[in-house]
């Protein structure tokens, strides 16, 4: 995500639960990185929100959230006015968001269900893939390959 988004002109702020993951994010093009704690409480939520605001004082325009849970609200608090919060998944649990923040920030929360999207809008989905592959073939970014496997080891 970092490389693709940078290739499209975005300033990328990556968050992760370990220094090792943040290092990969940096190698993959993140401009800023923020470590988040594995166990969240109210104080840690406030700290995470403050850390995000420190690297993006004017707020974050687009938040791509695959984690959810207790990590969602601090991110929403760091969103820019008229920002977009993309709900991609919720591996840390279904988030509970104070909707008054959407009013105060004049932002949007958008659910992104790629599985359904590719079935309902196959032409747009194909164009998105074509655009990404073109960026790869044009040398704008190189996908991260973390592992390789023999074909015999596949299922």
Description of each model-found segment:
Residues 1-3:
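Conserved small/polar residues in nucleotide/adenosyl-binding loops
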Residues 7-71, 124-127:
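Adenosine-nucleotide cofactor-binding segment
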Residues 122-155:
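C-terminal hydrophobic helical "lid"/dimerization subdomain
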Residues 79-80:
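Helix-to-beta-strand junctions that scaffold the AdoMet/dcAdoMet cofactor pocket
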Residues 83:
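Glycine-centered, small-residue-biased loops immediately flanking beta-strands
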Residues 13, 86, 110:
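Conserved beta-strand positions in the Rossmann-like core of class I SAM-dependent methyltransferases
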Residues 92-105:
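Rossmann-fold NAD(P)-binding glycine/threonine-rich loop
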């Amino acid at each position: 995500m970092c490389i693709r988004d940078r290739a499209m002109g975005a300033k990328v702020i990556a968050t992760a639960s370990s220094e090792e993951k943040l290092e990969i994010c940096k190698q993959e093009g993140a401009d800023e990185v923020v470590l988040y704690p594995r166990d969240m409480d109210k104080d840690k939520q406030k700290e995470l929100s403050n850390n995000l605001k420190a690297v993006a004082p004017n707020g974050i325009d687009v938040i791509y959230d695959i984690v959810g849970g207790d990590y969602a609200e601090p991110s929403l608090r760091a969103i820019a006015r008229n920002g977009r919060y993309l709900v991609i998944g919720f591996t840390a649990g279904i988030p509970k968001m104070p909707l008054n923040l959407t009013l105060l920030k004049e932002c949007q929360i958008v659910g992104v269900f790629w599985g359904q999207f590719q079935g309902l809008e196959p032409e747009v989905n194909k164009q998105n893939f074509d655009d990404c592959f073109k960026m790869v073939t044009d040398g704008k970014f190189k996908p991260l390959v973390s592992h390789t496997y023999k074909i015999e080891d596949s299922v």
